[in-house]
Amino acid sequence: MAEQNDSNGNYDDGEEITEPEQLRKLFIGGLDYRTTDDGLKAHFEKWGNIVDVVVMKDPKTKRSRGFGFITYSQSYMIDNAQNARPHKIDGRTVEPKRAVPRQEIDSPNAGATVKKLFVGGLRDDHDEECLREYFKDFGQIVSVNIVSDKDTGKKRGFAFIEFDDYDPVDKIILQKTHSIKNKTLDVKKAIAKQDMDRQGGGGGRGGPRAGGRGGQGDRGQGGGGWGGQNRQNGGGNWGGAGGGGGFGNSGGNFGGGQGGGSGGWNQQGGSGGGPWNNQGGGNGGWNGGGGGGYGGGNSNGSWGGNGGGGGGGGGFGNEYQQSYGGGPQRNSNFGNNRPAPYSQGGGGGGFNKGNQGGGQGFAGNNYNTGGGGQGGNMGGGNRRY
């Protein structure tokens, strides 16, 4: 007879657990606000023995944040659950994804959802057949492309493998070590260059150490969502500069800070130049200088600025993303020493009209300042996810 072993109502039937937790944990996004721990467990226990389950809640309101985690006793149970997609709980289709290990949270592409795999470290004797033979166990392969020099035809030592689903790629990355013909290979998620630029890495929507779409905060709060970490007086793309940031930071309009440094898409002034036709010393591109675009405002950020969380405030809701600087994990603040993916906080919702602003933006006073609170967009707080 199974015995209850923790406050979340999780059970342990004495089954020996030998695999790392990272291989047995599943992130569940897009949960209905009515879904409880018991409801989540009741659905997913059809595919295996669940040893831990939690629906993440706002610590103040106790309202569901729209996502949770389940941990199975064996990794193959994750495969069973993923093979049974789509999953519908309380009338809502949810989005399960293998949880990203805590130590990889800082990696900008760790939580990216992609179907293509980069395989490096290949020798000349590694051909398409051996790659297919090895990786077919993870999922259905669509194509294998071993890259060769256009002029000489010589193999360049790497290849791209595309699957019909994102889950095989996530599973391969979690396994860490892969060897073919006694050669250890370097496997990574294949991210298009333009997507890497958006997620951090020296360009749009982020910069060095930006962590992708908000280096230090959760799409907002502290450092600038959709922008860089401490990108003050520097010139950030899509947010960051001068402490402000887009999508729900205290100040900043979809890019651009309150002052000091300039960035793209509606800078308020300051030194340096940014993209989209910004000019140093004051005016930013796309209706800069004073009022902010997409809703104007001198210091209040459109799309849910001034501390309020755009797109649903502190509640995570259905608009979660995992590809920004880490992906799904929980923090120890929620009990049981579990790492957490998105920080708490909240307050205020985006897309709310306000009386502040009146700049030259696309809509004057519309879409300004999403209510009070210190939480950032999509979950406030001051932790990296």
Curated annotation (Swiss-Prot):
This is Heterogeneous nuclear ribonucleoprotein 87F. GO terms for biological process: compound eye morphogenesis; female gonad development; mitotic cell cycle; positive regulation of mRNA splicing, via spliceosome; regulation of alternative mRNA splicing, via spliceosome; response to heat; response to starvation. One of its GO terms (cellular component) is nucleoplasm. This protein is a component of ribonucleosomes. Could be needed to organize a concentration gradient of a dorsalizing morphogen (Dm) originating in the germinal vesicle. The gene is Hrb87F. Residues 319-336 have a biased composition (Polar residues). It is found in: Nucleus; Cytoplasm. The keyword Repeat applies. InterPro entries: Nucleotide-bd_a/b_plait_sf (IPR012677), RBD_domain_sf (IPR035979), RRM_dom (IPR000504).
